[in-house]
Amino acid sequence: MEKIYERKFFRFFCGFLSFSFLIIFWELSDNQGNNPVTQVLPPPSQFLPVLFESDFKIGLGSQSATIYQSISITLIRVLSGMSLAFVGSIIIGLLLSLSKWSELFFVPILSVIAPIAPIAWVPIALVIFGIGNLTAIFIVFMGVFFTLTIATIAEIKRVPTNYIFTAANLGGSKFKIWKSVIIPSILPGVFTLLRLNFIAAWMAVLAAEMTGLRDGLGTVVMTGRNLFNSNLILLGICIIGITGFAVDRILLFIQNKFFWWSTN
């Protein structure tokens, strides 16, 4: 019998309940007179009306954009960078695994570059690409690609040898073994790591938007800072959190739907 805490509805209800208690506590704390916390972090009843009063637009003059545009711009940047990193890491990982010498020479380089924080690439990206979408996409790519490439090589080593021997005994060529055995075996693990790295990629693109770009969700927060508008800052932070959570759920759905053969 399935335990109650393993049921999807119960898990959803607990999450919804925890957020409800948080919002209620947040709102009630604003009624405690001169509360220094709510002066810096105004409750939702104060910063949410900002969205409706501005007709869902953020910014000044020609720099203003609707909140939908800000969300879509940021999503395009982070998903483009992650897609390029995912495909590139699979290709490079497969190529390096074809030769032990290539692995010996190049994996140490990947291992040195992988721990570098994505935000550290911002100055270089601005010099190379200037202010634009390519800067954000490059930063996301650099923050994810090297980790995924190392993971691809590790996943290839974990492919059970009996799978490969069985395919070879059945007359499978090297190409068919790679196509039908090795690649399907490594895809679930690499995609799982891609999903886990989404948080780092999400933070990287937001940091890029805050430091050098003129649009996106990160710019919403910076606009609030420049205007000394804590309501706008909190609004941007909440939208960032909700959007990031939604994308993570979508990636989890893709993982369960399209990589169903994974045993993990």
Give the role of each language-model region.
Residues 151-193, 217:
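Short cytoplasmic-facing helical segments at TM-TM junctions of multi-pass membrane proteins
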Residues 218-253:
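Hydrophobic alpha-helical transmembrane segments of polytopic membrane proteins
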Residues 32-83:
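Periplasmic/extracellular loop-to-transmembrane helix junction in inner-membrane transport proteins
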Residues 138, 142, 175-207, 235, ...:
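Transmembrane alpha-helices
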Residues 80-110:
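Transmembrane-helix boundary motif in ABC transporter permease subunits
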Residues 111-145, 154-155:
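Generic hydrophobic transmembrane alpha-helix motif, especially the helices
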Residues 68-80, 103, 110-113, 130, ...:
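Alpha-helical membrane-interface segments at transmembrane helix boundaries
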Residues 1-20, 249-264:
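Transmembrane alpha-helical segments of polytopic membrane transport and secretion proteins
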